[in-house]
């Protein structure tokens, strides 16, 4: 089993518990925003990430930092959840837990996450059209686009929804032609 699969197995019960707690408190949207904020902060601050993941730093110090950083910034449920993760020495799995949490919430809300790779930024009209097309394809209520700019695609785009990939990029077409020509010769 890969380490990512192992971490996902450990993270899933925590994510499920958080979804249940957030749902009971009627705070799913607020918790989503708060976890996105925390994830963004951790991605921007390597020092903070290293601090939380360091097993040599005591749980008390980590708890104090969480309290000072996030009190009055995020929902109290999120703070309590972070403190539980620190107590159980699972704070190093926070990224995976947040990812699993969002997956579960999006499933609950019939939301599909579509990763879109494009060479240029899509306009609002293009994004709306893409969202509508993905809604039709997946029969979902809502679609969340995660757009990444990849200039090497030249033109077109790549859409990843779960394990499915739709590649309409010029780069993908050229790669396909190259593979065909290499196979023929």
From Swiss-Prot:
Classification via Pfam families: OSCP
Compartment(s): Plastid, Chloroplast thylakoid membrane
Listed GO MF terms: proton-transporting ATP synthase activity, rotational mechanism
GO cellular component annotations of the record: chloroplast thylakoid membrane; proton-transporting ATP synthase complex
Domain of life: Eukaryota
The keyword Repeat is assigned to this record: no
This protein's UniProt keywords: ATP synthesis, CF(1), Chloroplast, Hydrogen ion transport, Ion transport, Membrane, Plastid, Thylakoid, Transport
Membrane topology annotation: Peripheral membrane protein
HAMAP family: ATP_synth_delta_bact (MF_01416)
General function of this protein: F(1)F(0) ATP synthase produces ATP from ADP in the presence of a proton or sodium gradient. F-type ATPases consist of two structural domains, F(1) containing the extramembraneous catalytic core and F(0) containing the membrane proton channel, linked together by a central stalk and a peripheral stalk. During catalysis, ATP synthesis in the catalytic domain of F(1) is coupled via a rotary mechanism of the central stalk subunits to proton translocation.
Quaternary structure, from the entry: F-type ATPases have 2 components, F(1) - the catalytic core - and F(0) - the membrane proton channel. F(1) has five subunits: alpha(3), beta(3), gamma(1), delta(1), epsilon(1). CF(0) has four main subunits: a(1), b(1), b'(1) and c(10-14). The alpha and beta chains form an alternating ring which encloses part of the gamma chain. F(1) is attached to F(0) by a central stalk formed by the gamma and epsilon chains, while a peripheral stalk is formed by the delta, b and b' chains.
Family: Belongs to the ATPase delta chain family.
Stated name of the protein: ATP synthase subunit delta, chloroplastic
Organism the protein comes from: Gracilaria tenuistipitata var. liui (Red alga)
């Amino acid at each position: 089993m890969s380490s990512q699969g192992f971490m996902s197995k450990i993270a899933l019960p925590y994510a499920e518990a958080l979804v249940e707690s957030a749902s009971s408190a009627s705070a799913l949207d607020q918790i989503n925003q708060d976890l996105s904020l925390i994830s963004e902060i951790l991605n921007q601050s390597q020092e903070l990430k290293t601090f939380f993941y360091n097993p040599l730093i005591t749980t008390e110090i980590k708890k104090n930092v969480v309290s000072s950083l996030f009190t009055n910034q995020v929902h109290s449920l999120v703070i309590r959840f972070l403190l539980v993760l620190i107590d159980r020495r699972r704070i190093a799995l926070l990224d995976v837990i947040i990812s699993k949490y969002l997956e579960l919430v999006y499933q609950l809300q019939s939301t599909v996450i579509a990763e879109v790779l494009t060479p240029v930024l899509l306009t609002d009209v293009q994004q709306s059209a893409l969202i509508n097309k993905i809604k039709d394809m997946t029969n979902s209520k809502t679609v969340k686009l995660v757009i990444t700019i990849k200039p090497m695609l030249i033109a077109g785009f790549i859409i990843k929804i779960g394990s499915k990939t739709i590649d309409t990029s010029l780069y993908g077409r050229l790669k396909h032609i190259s593979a065909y020509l290499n196979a023929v010769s």
